[in-house]
C-alpha cells in the first residue's frame, strides 16, 4: 500500500506549485508534548478517511474538532493533508493554526525538498517523515532542511530494521513507532513494546496508530512512550472531549 501511495505522491509532486506563505507564531511540538497535563502527551489527529478504514466521517469541521481537542488536553494536532487517500487538505493547517494555540503537525507523505518548502508555506509547526519511504540519508537531508526552516519532524518507523538504519545516520529528536503494518493494515501496540527498547533515551518517543483503549495507552507508556498519536478512536466519536477523558483515565492507565 505504501508503494501505491508514494507513486501517487510522486505524481503530485511533479505538479506541485508553492502556495503563498502563511505566517503564524511557531509552537514547538517537542516542548508541547513534554509539558502535557495528561498522563502522557497526546497528538490528536484530524483524519476524515484512511486507506485501512475508508470514510470515518462524512463531513468534518477541522476547526471545531481542533477546538475540542485543545479543550480535552491534547498537546498537538495532527492534520492529514493528503487528499487522495485521506480526504485531507493543505488548507486545514492554516485553519487549525488560526483556531488553537497548539502546535500543528502536517501529516502527509513528504518525499521532496519542495514539499518541505510547502509545509513551511502552509503554516505547519512540524511534519511527518516516514523511514519506510526513503533511504535514511535522504530522510536526514529532508530533516535538516525542515529544521533550517523552523519546522520540527516526527520521524516514523515501522520496524526494528528501519530504526537501526536511521540510527546509523542520526538520532531524530522525536521518533514515532507506527503500530500499523502497512501490508495487512493490522495494528498492535506490541510493535511499540518491541521496538521502544531500541529508541535512544534522548529522543522523545511517540506511539502511533491503533490506540483505542486506556490499556493500549498504559502498555505503550510502560514500554517507554512519552506520547501517543490517535486518529480513528477520536474521529469516530461525537463527543471527542469525553473520548479523550475516557482514554486517559488516570486510574486505568496507572493501575
Ligand atoms: O490510517 C491508515 O489506514 C494508513 C494507511 C497507510 C499509511 C498510513 C496510514 N495512516 C496514517 C497514520 O499514521 C495514522 O493516521 C495515525 O497514526 C493515526 O492512526 P489511528 O489512531 O489508528 O487512526
Swiss-Prot record:
Reaction(s) this enzyme catalyzes, per UniProt: 1-(2-carboxyphenylamino)-1-deoxy-D-ribulose 5-phosphate + H(+) = (1S,2R)-1-C-(indol-3-yl)glycerol 3-phosphate + CO2 + H2O
Enzyme class, UniProt record, top EC level: lyase
Enzyme Commission designation: 4.1.1.48
An example Gene Ontology molecular-function term: indole-3-glycerol-phosphate synthase activity
Sorted UniProt keywords: Amino-acid biosynthesis, Aromatic amino acid biosynthesis, Decarboxylase, Lyase, Tryptophan biosynthesis
A Pfam family annotated for this UniProt entry: IGPS
Pathway: Amino-acid biosynthesis; L-tryptophan biosynthesis; L-tryptophan from chorismate: step 4/5
Homology family: Belongs to the TrpC family.
Protein name from the UniProt record: Indole-3-glycerol phosphate synthase
